[in-house]
């Protein structure tokens, strides 16, 4: 392994941070040895409760069950908005930076309270009640956050669907969630282009009976079809709504939201997060991982359609009374300096983005960064996938001027909040390492036979004890939760990731070990992409694997077998990419398509994906044993025609 570059925390920086190493060690030890006391103290410190809990936690990983703060009642919206009004009514809660550099808004906590309260009444006036599911299919505009908080206020369960998903993908999620309402916009705007959200929503709703309301925000004023009485303009409904909307006090374990994530079986799974544990852990991690202090301007570049947007644009920051920035655009529009121009414009102190964005910006050179000041920055973060040390060093040296610590955070949709990360004032940084576990997190490394590995080792990453923001179930299919996360290693949660632990106890995430790709920080199931490809009448079979991509982290490599009499062509490549875009969305479009005369299969008919991964990676000297294949000659043909030479 190449030499690891260690970056000690500067002494003057340590003095200003919320947590030093001694405090981290003490808190972490208590969180493992006396979790009841630890989490009770954090719950009192960070959240407001209507009624107290009976028990802090009870869990059984064999059954995939966990409950935190049972007996307590609270409201997530109240904790994110109302309780801040006495001291923060005039403080900016959300800075919105539009796609064009001359568009921005500052929304105070008082304004946020009024908008969300009205929005809650709009939903109630349309018959949405506690426990109902509401799908949100929105661009990155303040109304997306209002919608989430309004649902939480009235006890409805939101399910945000990323605006880049296709009508078919949206339809699947609406049906699975059994939603009664959809909140969307006429169009989204991103990188100077419009996204036809209402058109997509109309296609998705075609033939669906459960949705009685489609509330539409006017973002661009573009032409849209209208279906009364289902369709309602947001601005018209809000004009008549009262701002008096009492929060619905819910049980600690009542669901806050469902968020769909890719699985290895091809059918997206609805990850259910509940109110108290999720809100507590997002508040805790936002405060200490980002060393958030009063007055800081915090910017997470994620989309609210992903878990990072839920936890670290909306719930975590607002629970802490922070100022959070929402960005509608992309890092390279109108030019490659945009991110750093936004940092200077709004005096951003904390910047949290994905390695994919860092690598893309690194590829455009230092000049777009260096023509800006960035003097306000004090902390940088990364999320979504492992960051390679070269990109880490560039981010540290060029973006942060070698003075801003980087928090490389590992977590998942299912974990709800950051699980492994360095605390900026407490530990020395190693480029590319996610570092140390957060409070209450007990990681373990397992070998393929299920034996736990001690000391410095590499293996499959598991979590050995429950944590407050843990996934509670897969919506409508608890058995799938058990099969996916709690069956591989008895009594442990299996993350699906591989990891290495070094001699200092630092963790290094090595990537997925299951059939899920991590493309630009977005999880995509290979089976879902394969299912889309074989819809084409020329394709008999498809197998999708990941390969190393300089910008995206992982690229999508699709092997496709043709029907008899069909031939591969550039036209067919385009048609297949368009088909995947239509079925899932542009993020799932294959980078490389390899027309294969056959796929390597065992005699029982199982595709040997290990071999396909090796060929896609151009690692031809480590294919391993191919003698068990039904037709070993297929491998030579695949090698000769490989797309990633």
UniProtKB/Swiss-Prot annotation:
A biological process term (GO) from this entry: acetyl-CoA biosynthetic process from acetate
Pfam families recorded: ACAS_N, AMP-binding, AMP-binding_C
Entry comment on modification after translation: Acetylated. Deacetylation by the SIR2-homolog deacetylase activates the enzyme.
Catalysed reaction, written as an equation: acetate + ATP + CoA = acetyl-CoA + AMP + diphosphate
E.C. numbers: 6.2.1.1
Gene Ontology cellular component annotations, sorted alphabetically: cytosol
Modified residues (N6-acetyllysine): 606
Cofactor(s) annotated in UniProt: Mg(2+)
Class of the enzyme per the UniProt entry, highest EC level: ligase
InterPro entries, sorted: Ac_CoA_lig, ACAS_N, AMP-bd_C, AMP-bd_C_sf, AMP-dep_synth/lig_dom, ANL_N_sf
GO MF term list: acetate-CoA ligase activity; AMP binding; ATP binding; metal ion binding
Binding site for ATP: 384-386, 408-413, 497, 512, 523
Residues that bind CoA: 190-193, 308, 520
Keyword set, alphabetical order: Acetylation, ATP-binding, Ligase, Magnesium, Metal-binding, Nucleotide-binding
Binding-site residues for Mg(2+), renumbered to this chain: 534, 536, 539
SUPFAM superfamilies for this protein: Acetyl-CoA synthetase-like
Family assignment from sequence similarity: Belongs to the ATP-dependent AMP-binding enzyme family.
Function: Catalyzes the conversion of acetate into acetyl-CoA (AcCoA), an essential intermediate at the junction of anabolic and catabolic pathways. AcsA undergoes a two-step reaction. In the first half reaction, AcsA combines acetate with ATP to form acetyl-adenylate (AcAMP) intermediate. In the second half reaction, it can then transfer the acetyl group from AcAMP to the sulfhydryl group of CoA, forming the product AcCoA.
Name listed for the protein in its UniProt record: Acetyl-coenzyme A synthetase
Provenance organism: Alcanivorax borkumensis (strain ATCC 700651 / DSM 11573 / NCIMB 13689 / SK2)
